[in-house]
Amino acid sequence: GAVLWDRNKGDLVTVSARAVILATGGSGQLRLQGFPTSNHLGATGDGLVLAYRQGCKLLHGESYQYHPSGTAYPEALVGQLVTESIRSTGAQVVNAEGERFIGEMTFRDVLAAAIIREVAEKRGAQTPTHRAGVWLDTPLIDIINGEGTLRRQFPGIVHRFERYQIDPAKQPILIYPTLHYQNGGIQVDRDGCTEAKGLWAAGEVTGGLHGTNRLMGNSLLDITVFGRRAALSAQNDLPPRRPVTLTCLKKSREQFKNISDRREVLSPQLFPTQAGMKVAFELQKAEEPSATGFNSSGPSTYEPPDPFSK
């Protein structure tokens, strides 16, 4: 099972389970070496710690992918991705002097390293918030492909920056590598099984699927293939469940038949294994049926035998 934290209520909740699948994602929010991140707020490496404490092996823990075109300005957008498609459509990467220093569609790690080097060697542009980056020349897209191309093909990017009075069709975007993907993680087999009994893992929390580098979109394998395999493996490994039968319901109905003046049960009848608690039956005292249907003169004081008592 697991102990969960209800963020809305601030309470800890204990959940019993015979199988647990860890899918906690990466650890970008640790902001390793001060890098911004594209990861969600929950990407704090908790899954790695949980698995390690259960005796699971971790691999490639030193390997992370830095997306080369993370936003560096404005501050509210720092770390958010600017898709590679922007570069493949014509936007070039240039330093503060306007010099193009690398091919835009080279491997992510090579491009990210080149941008970091330009900034480290003082050829990057500085922001009012003391960050630095290089320019992604987005106005080139409309110059090369015709006016309106950027807004038509990348409306989300345009709207995102326009909220901060930046028009990417007229102004370049400042970018810097952002901590994007945790290549390493929990060691699992082809079905997502870890070395801890009853524990599976899937997604970015696992390691080995991408080696120590990865290509864009490869995380789809985690979702469509290995996530499904882990779920099926966990399901197949569970012991047979006790079948739900009508035995309890039949016994309770037999007892109610012995109550001479009860015409009908008005309360729902629940299986004790589903209710999880003692079910109190509230009956209404029945009068003789009239022409207008069933009437009641008030609640009954009769206490029927409890079919669920020991």
PLM segments and residue spans:
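Short beta-strand segments that buttress and anchor functional surface loops
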Residues: 1-6
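Glycine-/small-residue-rich beta->alpha transition segments that form the dinucleotide
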Residues: 8, 17-19, 23-28, 166, ...
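Core beta-strand elements of the Rossmann-like FAD/NAD(P) dinucleotide-binding domain
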Residues: 8-19, 194-198
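Glycine-rich loop(s) and the adjacent beta-strand/alpha-helix scaffold that form part
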Residues: 19-76, 80, 128, 217-233
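An anion/pyrophosphate-binding glycine-rich loop and adjacent beta-alpha core
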Residues: 56-167, 171, 219, 233-239
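Glycine- and aromatic-enriched mobile tails/lids
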Residues: 94-105, 109-110, 120, 181, ...
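FAD/FMN-dependent oxidoreductases across multiple families
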Residues: 160-197
